[in-house]
Amino acid sequence: MELVLVFLCSLLAPMVLASTAEKEKEMDPFHYDYQTLRIGGLVFAVVLFSVGILLILSRRCKCSFNQKPRAPGDEEAQVENLITANATEPQKAEN
Protein backbone atom coordinates (compact mmCIF):
# COMPACT_ATOMS: atom_id res chain seq x y z
CA MET A 1 0.00 0.00 0.00
CA GLU A 2 2.81 2.36 0.87
CA LEU A 3 4.52 1.56 -2.40
CA VAL A 4 1.41 2.55 -4.37
CA LEU A 5 1.12 5.78 -2.42
CA VAL A 6 4.77 6.66 -3.07
CA PHE A 7 4.30 5.85 -6.77
CA LEU A 8 1.24 8.11 -7.05
CA CYS A 9 3.00 10.92 -5.23
CA SER A 10 6.00 10.59 -7.51
CA LEU A 11 3.67 10.95 -10.51
CA LEU A 12 2.10 14.08 -9.03
CA ALA A 13 5.40 15.79 -8.26
CA PRO A 14 6.29 16.63 -11.91
CA MET A 15 2.74 17.86 -12.49
CA VAL A 16 2.98 20.24 -9.55
CA LEU A 17 6.41 21.47 -10.61
CA ALA A 18 5.21 22.02 -14.19
CA SER A 19 2.18 23.99 -13.04
CA THR A 20 4.28 26.23 -10.77
CA ALA A 21 6.72 26.85 -13.61
CA GLU A 22 3.83 27.95 -15.85
CA LYS A 23 2.49 30.25 -13.14
CA GLU A 24 5.91 31.88 -12.75
CA LYS A 25 6.02 32.53 -16.48
CA GLU A 26 2.54 34.05 -16.42
CA MET A 27 3.32 36.22 -13.39
CA ASP A 28 5.33 39.18 -14.63
CA PRO A 29 6.97 40.91 -11.64
CA PHE A 30 6.87 44.29 -13.38
CA HIS A 31 3.18 44.26 -14.22
CA TYR A 32 1.36 46.34 -11.64
CA ASP A 33 -2.37 46.66 -11.19
CA TYR A 34 -2.63 50.43 -10.86
CA GLN A 35 -6.43 50.46 -10.74
CA THR A 36 -6.55 48.29 -7.61
CA LEU A 37 -3.72 50.29 -6.05
CA ARG A 38 -5.55 53.54 -6.75
CA ILE A 39 -8.83 52.26 -5.29
CA GLY A 40 -7.05 50.91 -2.21
CA GLY A 41 -5.31 54.24 -1.68
CA LEU A 42 -8.55 56.16 -2.00
CA VAL A 43 -10.31 53.86 0.46
CA PHE A 44 -7.43 54.29 2.91
CA ALA A 45 -7.55 58.08 2.52
CA VAL A 46 -11.32 58.17 3.06
CA VAL A 47 -11.01 56.05 6.21
CA LEU A 48 -8.28 58.30 7.64
CA PHE A 49 -10.26 61.42 6.73
CA SER A 50 -13.40 60.04 8.39
CA VAL A 51 -11.49 59.11 11.55
CA GLY A 52 -10.05 62.62 11.68
CA ILE A 53 -13.46 64.24 11.31
CA LEU A 54 -14.93 61.94 13.98
CA LEU A 55 -12.10 62.84 16.38
CA ILE A 56 -12.70 66.53 15.82
CA LEU A 57 -16.46 66.24 16.23
CA SER A 58 -16.31 63.96 19.27
CA ARG A 59 -14.36 66.57 21.28
CA ARG A 60 -12.53 63.86 23.20
CA CYS A 61 -9.20 65.60 22.72
CA LYS A 62 -9.44 68.23 25.45
CA CYS A 63 -6.73 70.08 27.28
CA SER A 64 -6.38 69.22 30.95
CA PHE A 65 -6.29 72.89 31.99
CA ASN A 66 -8.61 75.77 31.17
CA GLN A 67 -7.39 78.21 28.58
CA LYS A 68 -8.87 81.63 28.12
CA PRO A 69 -9.73 82.51 24.52
CA ARG A 70 -7.03 84.52 22.84
CA ALA A 71 -7.25 87.28 20.32
CA PRO A 72 -6.05 86.38 16.79
CA GLY A 73 -2.91 88.56 17.03
CA ASP A 74 -2.08 87.52 20.59
CA GLU A 75 0.22 84.66 19.56
CA GLU A 76 2.32 86.94 17.38
CA ALA A 77 2.63 89.50 20.19
CA GLN A 78 3.71 86.77 22.61
CA VAL A 79 6.44 85.58 20.23
CA GLU A 80 7.68 89.15 19.74
CA ASN A 81 7.81 89.64 23.52
CA LEU A 82 9.90 86.49 23.92
CA ILE A 83 12.30 87.61 21.20
CA THR A 84 12.78 91.06 22.74
CA ALA A 85 13.12 89.56 26.24
CA ASN A 86 15.87 87.21 25.06
CA ALA A 87 17.64 90.02 23.23
CA THR A 88 17.75 92.30 26.30
CA GLU A 89 19.00 89.63 28.73
CA PRO A 90 22.74 89.86 29.45
CA GLN A 91 24.80 86.96 28.24
CA LYS A 92 26.01 84.69 31.02
CA ALA A 93 29.72 84.01 31.08
CA GLU A 94 30.72 80.39 31.28
CA ASN A 95 33.84 79.31 33.15
Swiss-Prot record:
It is found in: Cell membrane. Associates with and regulates the activity of the sodium/potassium-transporting ATPase (NKA) which catalyzes the hydrolysis of ATP coupled with the exchange of Na(+) and K(+) ions across the plasma membrane. Reduces the apparent affinity for intracellular Na(+) with no change in the apparent affinity for extracellular K(+). In addition to modulating NKA kinetics, may also function as a regulator of NKA localization to the plasma membrane. Residues 1-18 form the signal peptide. It is a single-pass type I membrane protein. This is FXYD domain-containing ion transport regulator 6. The lineage of its organism: Eukaryota, Metazoa, Chordata, Craniata, Vertebrata. It comes from Macaca fascicularis (Crab-eating macaque). It holds the Pfam family ATP1G1_PLM_MAT8. The gene is FXYD6. One of its GO terms (cellular component) is plasma membrane.
